[in-house]
Every structure is written in structure tokens, then in C-alpha cells.
């Protein structure tokens, strides 16, 4: 195991990571997210994606991951410098000298031998992945408020039907202004060279070197390529020790029964997303049916798969209901075990006007207090993982940070502009759904 003698995350960091450099992260070598629809990659979900060179992958499928940009960032980490794209972790670490950022969690999953090899090899060396998250396309029946057309075909339909969201001055990336056609470079039925390169690399190396292959989307269970991979695992049992993981929104339309039946005998983890309960969850994650989601969670928890994981994207709207959501998930744990589900709490940064920092400090402190009460209630419970306690602890500290600067009024204006248009397009009502935020919302002009 990567950790020794029940050491804490901080003890592990000091023993394994800090002796290499002040910025080393195993994810830069051994982990990747790759969007095959757009031909982009990143080392984890925090840095922005960048383009994969089409010529390079025609000669070397491993260039899907081993891009020029990643090799430059590896060299920076070997020298103890901080790559700019990894600022999510640097901000967490700068909050206190012993703060644990995600680079610890992205590193601890790899063997010390692999980590030593990564640090010692020249930065231009190609590495085979150990963990990979892959998206074949953006087909999805949800259009979550913090998502955008680059990752959801339902979001594309909104923009094409209703036009761009307007008057969003802080959205410099234009998340909600166009259909992001570059996110789906090839039409359905056309040959996609990025998909071809992936399956080549899978056959030559990845099925041997990957410890986990995680399929995301869009909604991956709506992609034929996902079922193609599941069929490969069924037909080649014993040939690969790779664990299969699938991100799914567990919507009404998702055929959970087919998934569980098709993966019998395959080591499977299921990841899903949510961060609050009932109508507030349905507002944020447009397309969600809360009752259907809970029913699917129950079905999976009873199925005997390896693990069930819930990813919480911490945004401004989820904070009122987050304590109740955590309590609901603890009830699941008590009924099944601590891994059904495990939880992660990732603070949303983009779009910035949906981040928790858009709220006034007094509101954020109120929600920090409520989350802290839940944390105190459960932190010594054997059902809680150390990473869950640590991530909630850092969330409480984050919410209590004062925020000043010229961008805050613009972010708050965009918050009101966006949700006003979101309500009109989606048939929703912000004030009725979030009475806790009514006063704040209505005073924005």
C-alpha cells in the first residue's frame, strides 16, 4: 500500500512527495482525462484542457497523454516550480503550511516505485498511464447549471434553440455563448482519429498498465463506445487487471439494470454526482429526478460492485442543502458500508459567478457553521474516510475566507443575469427553490 503504518495524509506527503520537490504531483505522469470528441487532455480535473497533436497520435498513440505541454510541466515539477494550470492546489496549500491539496490524493494512489521513476526520468520521456478518465463524446440528457455545451448535448440544444446567454461580463471563456462545436469535431458515424488512437493504445499497452479506466461523458452510458469497451472486458476476462469505473448521472433514462447485468464478473466502480437534495438538486442538475437518483443509488449499493462514489461540485447554490445531503449519504453508508458511497467535495471555480465566493461573507459563514456542525457530528465515525473529513475541513476554511476585489460585483451581477435567463429557458424559479438566498438574490441590480 502507498501509505505505511497508518500514516496520515500529511505524514505521507512529507515522506514521499516533499523529498522530491515542493510541487511534485504523480498525476502529471500517471493520470489523465482525455476528451476524444474534442481531442483535448489534462492531467486531472483542475487544470484547463489543452489540445492533443493529431499528427503525433498518428505516429504514437501514447501522445494522447504525453503532450508537449505536460512534458514542460513535468520538468517544472522536477525543479520544484509551480505550473500555472495547477493553481487550484496551490491556493489550497497557501491557506496554511499543512493544508492537504488534491495533489496528495492524486499521488498516493501510485506506487512509490512508479513515483521515483517519474521523478528521476528525463521530462521528455513517454509514460504509460496508471489511471485514465476518458470521454468519447458529449451526449448527455442533463444540462446542469455549472456545465456547458462543451460537455452536454442538451446544453447544445438550449443554446441552438434559445441563443446565447447575454450580459455575462465575467464569463471570459464564453461558456454559455455558443454551441462549442469544437468539442465534437466529428459527427456521429464519422471516423474519429482520437478514438482510433485510444483503442490502438488500449490494445498495445493500456490494458496492461492501467489500474483504473474511468469512462465519463456526457453521459457515457449513452455512448456506443462505452458498451464496446464493456464488451471487450466481458470477452477478455483475465487478460486485463484494469478496474473499470463509469461516471453516470443516474438519471431516469440510464439503464442501470443493463449496466449491472453486463458487468457481472468485472471489477466495477460507479461514480455519480450530486451535492444537495430534492428540488434544489433538480434545479442545479437540470434533468435530474431526485427520487430516481436515490432509487438507482439503492440498486447499485445492493448489487455487489466494488464501490460507489458521489462527487460533490461545491457551488453557491448547493450550500443551503449540503449538510442534509451529507446526512443522507451517511445513512447510505450505515445501511451498506463506508464505500457505498464514498464522497468527494470539489470546490467549483468556473464559471466563477457560480462559485461559493459569489455569496456575501455573512452567508458563507452561516453555511460554514452548518457544514462544520455536520463535520463535528461525523468526523470520528468509522464510516467517514480521512479524505472526506479533510475535504470538508478545507471547505469550511475556504468559506470563511474574506473576499474583496473589483470582480465581486461583476460576479454577482452575472449570477443574477444567468439564473434569470436559466429560469426562463428551463421553466424554473430561483426564489421559490432557494428561499435561503432570496434576500441576496433580489438585492442584486
Regions found by a protein language model. Give the residues of each.
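Recognition helices and adjacent regulatory flanks at domain boundaries
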Residues: 96-130, 140-142, 163
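Short, intrinsically disordered, charge-biased short linear motifs at domain edges
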Residues: 9-14, 65-79, 128-135
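Core AdoMet radical
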Residues: 129-139, 150-194, 207-226, 236-255, ...
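N-terminal pre-triad scaffold of radical SAM enzymes
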Residues: 30-43, 122-150, 210-214
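Radical SAM enzyme [4Fe-4S]-AdoMet core and its adjacent flexible, acidic
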Residues: 1-58, 62-65, 100-108, 156, ...
Amino acid at each position: 500500500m502507498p501509505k505505511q503504518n497508518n500514516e496520515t495524509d500529511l505524514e505521507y506527503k512529507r515522506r514521499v512527495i516533499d523529498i522530491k520537490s515542493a510541487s511534485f504531483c504523480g498525476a502529471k505522469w500517471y493520470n489523465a482525462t482525455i476528451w476524444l470528441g474534442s481531442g483535448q487532455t489534462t492531467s486531472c480535473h483542475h487544470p484547463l484542457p489543452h489540445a492533443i497533436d493529431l499528427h503525433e497520435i498518428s505516429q504514437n498513440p501514447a501522445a494522447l497523454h504525453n503532450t508537449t505541454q505536460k512534458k514542460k510541466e513535468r520538468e517544472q515539477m522536477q525543479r520544484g516550480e509551480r505550473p500555472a494550470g495547477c493553481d487550484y492546489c496551490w491556493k489550497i496549500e497557501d491557506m496554511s503550511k499543512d493544508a492537504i491539496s488534491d495533489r496528495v490524493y492524486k499521488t498516493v494512489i501510485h506506487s512509490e516505485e512508479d513515483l521515483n521513476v517519474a521523478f528521476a526520468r528525463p521530462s521528455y520521456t513517454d509514460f504509460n498511464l496508471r489511471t485514465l478518465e476518458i470521454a468519447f463524446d458529449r451526449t448527455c440528457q442533463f444540462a446542469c447549471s455549472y456545465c456547458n455545451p462543451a460537455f452536454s448535448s442538451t446544453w447544445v440544444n438550449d443554446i441552438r434553440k434559445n441563443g446565447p446567454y447575454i450580459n455575462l461580463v465575467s464569463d471570459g471563456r464564453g461558456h454559455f455563448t455558443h454551441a462549442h462545436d469544437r468539442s465534437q469535431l466529428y459527427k456521429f458515424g464519422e471516423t474519429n482519429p482520437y478514438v482510433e488512437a485510444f483503442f490502438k493504445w488500449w490494445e498495445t499497452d493500456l490494458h496492461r498498465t492501467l489500474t483504473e479506466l474511468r469512462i465519463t461523458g456526457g453521459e457515457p452510458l449513452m455512448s456506443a463506445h462505452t458498451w464496446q469497451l464493456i464488451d471487450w472486458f466481458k470477452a477478455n476476462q483475465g487478460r486485463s487487471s484494469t478496474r473499470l469505473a463509469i461516471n453516470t448521472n443516474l438519471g431516469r433514462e440510464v439503464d442501470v439494470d443493463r449496466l449491472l447485468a453486463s458487468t457481472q464478473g468485472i471489477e466495477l466502480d460507479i461514480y455519480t454526482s450530486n451535492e444537495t437534495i430534492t428540488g434544489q438538486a433538480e434545479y442545479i442538475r437540470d434533468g435530474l429526478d431526485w427520487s430516481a437518483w436515490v432509487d438507482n443509488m439503492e440498486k447499485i449499493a445492493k448489487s455487489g460492485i466494488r464501490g460507489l462514489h458521489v462527487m460533490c461540485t461545491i457551488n453557491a447554490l448547493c450550500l443551503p442543502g449540503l449538510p442534509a445531503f451529507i446526512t443522507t449519504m451517511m445513512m447510505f453508508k450505515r445501511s451498506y458500508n463506508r464505500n457505498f458511497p464514498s464522497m468527494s467535495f470539489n470546490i467549483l471555480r468556473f464559471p466563477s459567478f457560480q462559485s461559493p465566493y459569489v455569496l456575501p461573507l455573512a452567508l458563507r459563514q452561516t453555511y460554514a457553521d452548518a457544514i462544520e456542525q455536520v463535520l463535528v457530528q461525523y468526523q470520528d465515525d468509522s464510516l467517514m474516510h480521512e479524505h472526506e473529513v479533510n475535504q470538508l475541513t478545507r471547505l469550511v476554511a475556504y468559506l470563511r475566507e474574506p473576499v474583496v476585489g473589483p470582480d465581486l460585483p461583476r460576479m454577482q451581477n452575472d449570477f443574477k443575469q444567468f439564473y434569470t435567463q436559466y429560469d426562463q429557458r428551463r421553466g424554473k424559479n430561483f426564489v421559490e427553490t432557494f428561499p435561503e438566498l432570496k434576500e441576496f438574490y433580489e438585492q442584486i441590480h
